[in-house]
């Protein structure tokens, strides 16, 4: 395979993990970061100890503080940043891009102020003439396991399947299997909203409830995700795939999941400010819960689990009381509630 340069915007765990994959595939990954300490560590020690402790990076993984240097000559630009930084980074990228480029984003969330998905934010900020294609790379994955080269599957979603196939070709190897899909909306809705349900799974575990409770929460949570997704144009089949149920399972059941860990602390009685301070990293489900709270009301979508998690996060609702209220809701036929 011909070596290709790929720029990765974001020196966090996911950006670094994807850079490792590209280096394993004999490509030229360049990470753009904004902290001297992390950029220097990647270049000099071939580690990123804050985000991926105990992982040795291939020497082919390079990092820079210069956005221009990172994207110069890149076939693909991967945007691997927290959702709250998406607009400001895309404004910078729009100024820096000199020619149409394939853009890939791996950020899972909804913008609270606008209810826009991340691809819509990118389209808002980056001129169409500079976007060769926009691909969503998503699925059941923790960066830590990708960096350890454990078997993982993802889905590259794009309206232009030929662009999705290019991304598939650059990242696929014996450890990372990539599928393609044309349902961008479904991939983004599944990836964003599962973080809310993962907060709920953590809360359930923190309260000491068992597997039955978590299985119910995940299943009914997927019903809520599907309802909203279909209402905004997703293919319902997408939610049975990697970017739907797959991503939900891994995020609700793993100690690697920031959202599960945050929820677990909430379930044990800590308040949101304490939890976020202890986490020291972005917990996307908190921001997404705020966005979806208003969005679901606007669309008149019934999302009782999501609303309960919002109330625990932002209205000081007692978690046990929230569970009691959910369990006491009116009787329903299951198939009519999807």
Swiss-Prot record:
Reactions it catalyzes: sn-glycerol 3-phosphate + NAD(+) = dihydroxyacetone phosphate + NADH + H(+); sn-glycerol 3-phosphate + NADP(+) = dihydroxyacetone phosphate + NADPH + H(+)
InterPro entries xrefs: 6-PGluconate_DH-like_C_sf (IPR008927), 6PGD_dom2 (IPR013328), G3P_DH_NAD-dep (IPR006168), G3P_DH_NAD-dep_C (IPR006109), G3P_DH_NAD-dep_N (IPR011128), NAD(P)-bd_dom_sf (IPR036291)
Alphabetical GO biological process terms: carbohydrate metabolic process; glycerol-3-phosphate biosynthetic process; glycerol-3-phosphate catabolic process; glycerophospholipid metabolic process; phospholipid biosynthetic process
Metabolic or biological pathway, per its Swiss-Prot or TrEMBL entry: Membrane lipid metabolism; glycerophospholipid metabolism
Annotated positions binding NADPH: 13-14, 108, 143, 258, 282, 284
EC number of the protein: 1.1.1.94
Keyword list, A-Z: Cytoplasm, Lipid biosynthesis, Lipid metabolism, NAD, NADP, Nucleotide-binding, Oxidoreductase, Phospholipid biosynthesis, Phospholipid metabolism
A cellular-component GO term for this protein: cytosol
Catalytic residues (positions): 194 (proton acceptor)
GO molecular function ontology, one term from the record: glycerol-3-phosphate dehydrogenase [NAD(P)+] activity
Binding site for sn-glycerol 3-phosphate: 108, 139, 141, 194, 247, 257-259
HAMAP family for the chain: NAD_Glyc3P_dehydrog
Homology family: Belongs to the NAD-dependent glycerol-3-phosphate dehydrogenase family.
Entry protein name: Glycerol-3-phosphate dehydrogenase [NAD(P)+]
Highest classification ranks of the organism: Bacteria, Bacillati, Bacillota, Bacilli, Bacillales
Gene: gpsA
């Amino acid at each position: 395979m011909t070596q290709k340069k790929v720029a990765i915007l974001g020196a966090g765990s996911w950006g670094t993990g994807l850079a490792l994959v590209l280096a394993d595939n004999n490509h030229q990954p360049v990470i753009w970061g904004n902290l001297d300490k992390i950029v220097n560590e990647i270049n000099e020690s071939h580690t990123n100890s804050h985000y991926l402790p105990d992982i040795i990076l291939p020497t082919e993984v390079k990092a820079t503080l210069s956005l221009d240097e990172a994207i110069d000559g890149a076939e693909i630009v991967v945007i691997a940043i927290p959702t709250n930084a998406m607009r400001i980074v895309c404004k910078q990228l729009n100024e820096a891009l000199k020619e149409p480029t394939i853009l890939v984003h791996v950020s899972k969330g909804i913008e609270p102020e606008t209810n826009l998905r991340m691809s819509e934010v990118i389209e808002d900020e980056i001129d169409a003439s500079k976007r060769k294609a926009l691909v969503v790379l998503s699925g059941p994955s923790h960066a830590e396991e990708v960096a350890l080269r454990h078997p993982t599957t993802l889905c590259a979603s794009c309206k232009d399947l030929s662009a999705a196939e290019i991304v598939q070709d650059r990242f696929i190897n014996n450890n990372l299997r990539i599928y393609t899909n044309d349902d961008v909306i479904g991939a983004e809705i599944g990836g964003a909203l599962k973080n809310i349900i993962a907060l709920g799974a953590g809360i359930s575990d923190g309260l000491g409830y068992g597997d039955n409770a978590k299985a119910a929460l995940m299943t009914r949570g997927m019903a809520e995700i599907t309802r909203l997704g279909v209402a905004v144009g997703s293919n319902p089949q997408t939610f049975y795939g990697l970017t739907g149920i797959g991503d939900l399972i891994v995020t609700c059941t793993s100690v690697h999941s920031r959202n599960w860990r945050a929820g677990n602390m909430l379930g044990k009685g800590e308040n949101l400010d304490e939890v976020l301070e202890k986490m020291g990293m972005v917990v996307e489900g908190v921001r997404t819960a705020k966005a979806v709270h208003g969005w679901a009301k606007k669309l008149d979508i019934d999302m009782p689990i999501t609303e309960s998690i919002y109330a625990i996060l932002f209205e000081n609702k007692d978690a046990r009381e929230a569970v009691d209220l959910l369990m006491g809701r009116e009787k329903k036929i299951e198939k009519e509630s999807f």
